[in-house]
């Protein structure tokens, strides 16, 4: 229907009337407009893909202080970002009079409009969680690539036809070359209701931590249906933010309350970073179904498997990676002897199958083997050599954060005497080599020392 309407209602939008824009895109109806730009529904001449085209008037931009750098920032930021929850910039076109940003089409509108259409202007906590974890995933990706959004608000969060989130409008984004010598940003920008207190007070600030505050405001809005602080008076709003004078409705769960509190921390030094939420906060965790995710791996029992006499494996969201060498006495290690547990965590967007496969390949060099059978986890001894430490097992637990993001937890069990006293690392186990072997499968490592409850 949209494409038929486009054909019937081609408009003159700066793209040459009824002629395809630079021979590449047929412009249709207007989707929205701002001070200096209009956004049109369009269709690619080659292939027929539906896209959105943002048409920017050069004369108006050049005649307004600060607008030309903003357009350049938006293009520079979007060109370096390729993520399922970040609106994609396909290409940039230009004529003498106009600039055209050809972007991914988000047919679901913006988050603010979606909330406004609801009777109570809020989401159930489960639905709010789904939206919010996608937002956190997108911003974590941006921050890892040196991009701080600086204008995170529901109007700039779009939705596709399936309700998946797309962060948009990077016109105020800060790139690494925006930082001063002190490594901070100094330009106050954004929307006051969603801006961090340090930004409103025009102090030097960390762009990623400012985005974290904005995420806290959005989470509050998703759960409560209104802003945490009245924005009719900015000075009063800033005072209330510093005093944490907000109140969540009684139906909001305690884990969600704690998360809002950590995000709406007026002190940016103690405010939680969005990058740490997926790995560390319990509100984000959701168990994977191993039967559905790893069905292709369960192809029968290994022919050389030896029964592993230990506590039964955890429920269907866990695997054991068994590490052993000839002569290693497993019974002593899994008896009543003192043990130390060392953990590492990382996040990945690879599939569970791919992650487990890569762990298995790494095991060939580090002296362990991954075994998943119909009866559960079993031992498969490796031939040759002796490990330099009394490693008994390393379990791997995968939890779904938000598709396709997984949290992978590695727990290494060793005899107490095989742990160095200095840094708590396990003697002889090559964590650094494991990091190298996993390579691009790992999105980010999260140290165990940071695993305090958020």
Curated annotation (Swiss-Prot):
GO terms of molecular function: ATP binding; protein serine kinase activity; protein serine/threonine kinase activity
EC number of this enzyme: 2.7.11.1
Active site: 151
Cofactors (names): Mn(2+)
Keywords, comma-separated and alphabetical: ATP-binding, Kinase, Manganese, Nucleotide-binding, Serine/threonine-protein kinase, Transferase
Residue segments, region PPI: 341-370
Keyword Nucleus: no
Protein name: CBL-interacting protein kinase 4
Organism: Oryza sativa subsp. japonica (Rice)
């Amino acid at each position: 229907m949209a494409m038929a309407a486009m054909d019937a209602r081609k408009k003159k939008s700066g793209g040459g009337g009824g002629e395809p824009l630079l021979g590449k895109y047929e412009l249709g109806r207007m989707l929205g407009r701002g001070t200096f730009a209009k956004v049109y529904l369009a269709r690619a001449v080659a292939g027929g893909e539906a896209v959105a085209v943002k048409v920017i008037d050069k004369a108006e931009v050049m005649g307004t202080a600060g607008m030309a750098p903003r357009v350049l920032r938006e293009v520079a930021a979007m060109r370096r970002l390729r993520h399922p929850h970040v609106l994609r910039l396909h290409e940039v076109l230009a004529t003498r009079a106009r600039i055209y940003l050809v972007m991914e089409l988000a047919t679901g509108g913006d988050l603010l409009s979606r909330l406004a259409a609801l009777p109570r202007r809020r989401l159930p906590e489960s639905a709010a969680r789904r939206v919010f974890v996608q937002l956190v995933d997108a911003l974590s990706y941006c921050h890892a690539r040196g991009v701080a959004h600086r204008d995170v608000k529901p109007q700039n969060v779009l939705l596709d036809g399936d309700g998946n989130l797309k962060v948009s409008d990077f016109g105020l984004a800060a790139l690494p070359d925006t930082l001063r010598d002190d490594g901070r940003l100094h330009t106050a920008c954004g929307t006051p209701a969603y801006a961090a207190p340090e930004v409103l007070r025009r102090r030097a600030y960390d762009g990623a931590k400012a985005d974290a505050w904005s995420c806290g405001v959005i989470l509050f809005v998703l759960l409560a249906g209104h802003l945490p602080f009245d924005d009719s008076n900015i000075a009063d709003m800033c005072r209330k933010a510093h005093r944490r004078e907000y109140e969540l409705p009684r139906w909001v769960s305690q884990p969600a309350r704690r998360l809002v509190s950590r995000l709406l921390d007026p002190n940016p030094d103690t405010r939680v970073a969005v990058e740490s939420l997926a790995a560390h906060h319990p509100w984000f965790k959701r168990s994977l179904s191993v039967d559905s995710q790893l069905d292709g791996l369960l192809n029968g029992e290994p022919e050389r498997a030896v029964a592993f006499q230990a506590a039964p494996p955890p429920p269907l969201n866990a695997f054991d990676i068994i590490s052993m060498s000839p002569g290693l006495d497993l019974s002593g290690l899994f008896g009543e002897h003192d043990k130390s547990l060392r953990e590492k965590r990382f996040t990945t967007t690879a599939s569970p199958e791919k992650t487990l496969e890569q762990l298995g390949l790494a095991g060939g060099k580090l002296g362990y083997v991954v075994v998943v059978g119909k009866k559960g986890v079993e031992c498969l001894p490796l031939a040759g050599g002796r490990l330099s430490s009394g490693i008994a097992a390393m379990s791997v637990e995968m939890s779904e954060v938000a598709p396709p993001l997984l949290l992978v937890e590695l727990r290494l069990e060793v005899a107490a005497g095989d742990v160095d006293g200095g840094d708590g690392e396990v003697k002889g186990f090559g964590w650094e080599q494991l990091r190298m072997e996993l390579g691009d499968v790992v999105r980010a490592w999260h140290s165990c020392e940071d695993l305090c409850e958020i």
